[in-house]
Each structure stands twice: as structure tokens, then as C-alpha cells.
Design a protein with these regions (language model features):
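Conserved beta-strand elements of the Class I
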Residues: 21, 74, 94-96
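PLP-dependent aminotransferase class I/II
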Residues: 32-33, 54, 202-280, 284-287
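Short beta-strands and strand-loop turn motifs
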Residues: 118-120, 143-150, 176-180, 287-289
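Active-site pre-lysine segment of PLP-dependent enzymes
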Residues: 110, 127-139, 152-176, 180-212
Length: 295
């Protein structure tokens, strides 16, 4: 079986008999916060019960943290689960994705036989998105995926560009999915998020605990959307107990780890220029990314 996603440390261990120094998964280098680990241990007595399929306690905590009503929040088994649920709920015939970008968008779209149109970002412009992306959306496009900041380029679309793109999607009756899984690595993430645009029912914001909190193995993500009917369709598009009790407890605990988040952000801000300079000293071209990865 061919795996397109990074982080396949088990295959490396089976082949070479040791663990890899894995640069394929851009997860917090500080590991799982102790408060989250303790929350998982404390939740173990609940392991003999089915988890809350509506993630009510976690959604209440997310509502407070994000400033978004609970009714506009859906939790899933990682952001990838929600990407697939969105595609299965909408069943788009044609979708637009940038290139390069996260591979799971196209993988999900392939499962419903959707035609994937790729908008190739300009390397001479350091792969930065421009108004040309807005122009690529027409009435034949049912869904657009925008990774913000983009994986693997680390580039951001300006808030004004995202607003233009959403306006165009509204005109074309197109769903815009903005993936903000890496956005919270930025100290000024609040200035870049698409949350102020959530009143538009055409916008879905994808987020996850995976990267920032070092929780890739826990599998926990969530999405924000102003269209509650679409969220209900996404809820029923997959299996009902997608988020375990342990993951729900971990997520609620992670939201309290503000000092940990500050430490991760400070570490990335210090080390990004160091790594950039080192790679350039080797003669490599490095794109000035904004998150915790470099292309």
C-alpha cells in the first residue's frame, strides 16, 4: 500500500530497524504537553463507554477559545477526517486546489470522482497566492481548498485576498475551505484568520490540534462554519463516534496550554532564521515561509 502522507515512521523502523529523524511531519518539536498527557490518563476510566458523539464538552471549550457559537463547530478524527467529510457531504463535481499543497485535498476529492483542477502557484513569486487565484474560480467550480499558510510553501494569502476569494465563491455558489491547521504557529494568527468571514455560509475553516500541540497520534481536529445544515451533513457523512473520549479530554486540556503555545511560537520564531541561513549556506534556495516549515 502506497502512503502519500508523511509521518510514516513505522515503515522506516521496519525497514531500517531504528527510528527516523522525521522531517516529513511538521509537528511541534516540544512534544505532547504534560497537562494534555495527564488529561488522557484521567480520562481512561471512561474508556469502557462510548464517547459523546457530539463532543459537547470539547465544543463548549472551543466555543470559548475561538469566540464562535458551539452550533458552528464540528469535531473530527483529525483535520483529514473533516476534509473527507466535507467532500462526502457536498459531493463536488469539480474542485480547485493550488499546487503545490497538502495532498489530502485531492485524495478526498478522488473518492467521489471529482475533477480536480490545479492552480499552479508561481515559483518566481515564491509560490505566493495572488488575485489570479480568484480569477480561476468560475461557476463550474463547486469547491476550493486554500491552505493558510500553505503546506509546503509556508506562504500566506492576505486577508484581503481571502475576502476576495470568498466573495467570488459566493457569486459562483462555491464552497471555500480554508485550512488553518498551521496558522496558530504565527504569533499574530488573529490577524490572518478567516473567522471574521464566518457569516458567509460558503466558508469552512479547518483546524487541528495535531501540529501545534504535538498530538498527531491522538487524532483530533475541528471545523468552523456558518452553515449549520452543512455541518449536519458532515456529521452524518462519517461514522458517529469519530472522536474518542481520550481525544476529547486531550483537546479540552490543550486549550488551556497557553504557556506551551507561547513557547512553541517563540522557539519557531528563533529557529526559523537559523535553519534558513544554514540551508542557504549549503547553496539551497529557501522560500521565506511564515509557519513551522520551510520549502
Amino acid at each position: 500500500m502506497e502512503l502519500v502522507h508523511g509521518g510514516d515512521w513505522m515503515s522506516y523502523r521496519e525497514r531500517f530497524g531504528r527510528d527516523a529523524l522525521d522531517f516529513s511531519a511538521n509537528v511541534s518539536p516540544l512534544g505532547l504537553p504534560e497537562g494534555v498527557a495527564q488529561a488522557i490518563r484521567d480520562a481512561l476510566p471512561l474508556a469502557d463507554r462510548y464517547p459523546d458523539p457530539l463532543c459537547r464538552t470539547l465544543r463548549a471549550a472551543l466555543s470559548r477559545a475561538e469566540g464562535v457559537p458551539q452550533e458552528r463547530i464540528l469535531c473530527g478524527n483529525g483535520a483529514a477526517d473533516l476534509i473527507f467529510r466535507l467532500v462526502w457531504a457536498v459531493k463536488p463535481h469539480k474542485a480547485l486546489v493550488t499546487a503545490p499543497t497538502f495532498a489530502e485535498y485531492a485524495s478526498a476529492l478522488d473518492t467521489v470522482g471529482c475533477e480536480v483542477k490545479r492552480f499552479f502557484l508561481d515559483e518566481t513569486n515564491d509560490f505566493a497566492p495572488t488575485d489570479a487565484l480568484v480569477d480561476a474560480v468560475d461557476e463550474s467550480i463547486d469547491m476550493v481548498f486554500l491552505c493558510q499558510p500553505n503546506n509546503p510553501t509556508g506562504q500566506l494569502a492576505s486577508p484581503e485576498l481571502v475576502k476576495k476569494l470568498l466573495r467570488r465563491c459566493g457569486e459562483c455558489r462555491t464552497i471555500l475551505a480554508v485550512d488553518e491547521c498551521f496558522l496558530d504557529f504565527l504569533p499574530d494568527a488573529d490577524g490572518w484568520t478567516a473567522k471574521p468571514l464566518l457569516e458567509s455560509g460558503d466558508l469552512v475553516i479547518l483546524k487541528a490540534f495535531t501540529k501545534l500541540y504535538g498530538m498527531a497520534g491522538v487524532r483530533l481536529g475541528y471545523c468552523l462554519c456558518g452553515d449549520e445544515t452543512l455541518l449536519e451533513k458532515m456529521q452524518t457523512a462519517g461514522q458517529p463516534w469519530a472522536v474518542s473520549s481520550l481525544a476529547q479530554a486531550a483537546g479540552a486540556a490543550a486549550l488551556k496550554e497557553t504557556a506551551y503555545v507561547d513557547e512553541v511560537r517563540a522557539l519557531i520564531a528563533r529557529q526559523r532564521p537559523v535553519l534558513t541561513a544554514g540551508l542557504r549556506a549549503l547553496g539551497l534556495r529557501v522560500i521565506d515561509g511564515k509557519a513551522n516549515d520551510l520549502l
